[in-house]
Each structure stands twice: as structure tokens, then as C-alpha cells.
């Protein structure tokens, strides 16, 4: 059985104004991942995601590339203990 965990990621590059958060939400819902994504004042996007480990790996791989019009320069990740979220929200 795949364990459940959470991760916090910070994504920098051209990641605001390119539908990054909305695209992340769509994929997260497909992968049954909960959490949230928000823009930061410094131009980065912060993502907090919880789900099965294999699904989080797939999601993280996508975060490193982003949607079509994005350019990801750096994507950092911190694994965190499981938290029970119901949905994935764009903040």
C-alpha cells in the first residue's frame, strides 16, 4: 500500500499569469491530491499538496515543468507529515 504524505513546493520562473495554479488544480483533482496553490509577492508560486506518494511524485514531476506557457527555473520540495485536506484550492 502506498503511504500518504504531503509536500510543500516553491516554484520560480515565469509562473504567474500563465494559468499555473489553475492547471495545477486540474491535475491535482485528476490525481486525487488535496491542498492548495497560491501566488507569492516575490513572483513564485507556493503549492501545498497531500496524497498518495506515487501520485505526489507524478504531480511534482509536472510542477517542475508547469503548463504550456510557463517557464520553471527552480522547483524546491519539502516532504511533510500527512494532513487531511478535502479539496485542492487556488488561493
From Swiss-Prot:
GO terms for molecular function: acylphosphatase activity. The active site is at 21, 39. InterPro entries: Acylphosphatase, Acylphosphatase-like_dom, Acylphosphatase-like_dom_sf, Acylphosphatase_CS. PROSITE patterns: ACYLPHOSPHATASE_1 (PS00150), ACYLPHOSPHATASE_2 (PS00151), ACYLPHOSPHATASE_3 (PS51160). Keywords: Hydrolase. It is an enzyme of class 3 (hydrolase). Residues 6-91 form the Acylphosphatase-like domain. Its EC number is 3.6.1.7. It catalyses: an acyl phosphate + H2O = a carboxylate + phosphate + H(+). Belongs to the acylphosphatase family. This is Acylphosphatase. The gene is acyP.
Amino acid at each position: 500500500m502506498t503511504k500518504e504524505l504531503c509536500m510543500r513546493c516553491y516554484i520560480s520562473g515565469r509562473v504567474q499569469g500563465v494559468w499555473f495554479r489553475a492547471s495545477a488544480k486540474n491535475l491535482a483533482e485528476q490525481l486525487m491530491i488535496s491542498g492548495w496553490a497560491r501566488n507569492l509577492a516575490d513572483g513564485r508560486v507556493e503549492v501545498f499538496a497531500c496524497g498518495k506518494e506515487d501520485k505526489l511524485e507524478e504531480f511534482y514531476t509536472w510542477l517542475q515543468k508547469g503548463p504550456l506557457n510557463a517557464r520553471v527555473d527552480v522547483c524546491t520540495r519539502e516532504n511533510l507529515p500527512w494532513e487531511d485536506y478535502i479539496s485542492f484550492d487556488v488561493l
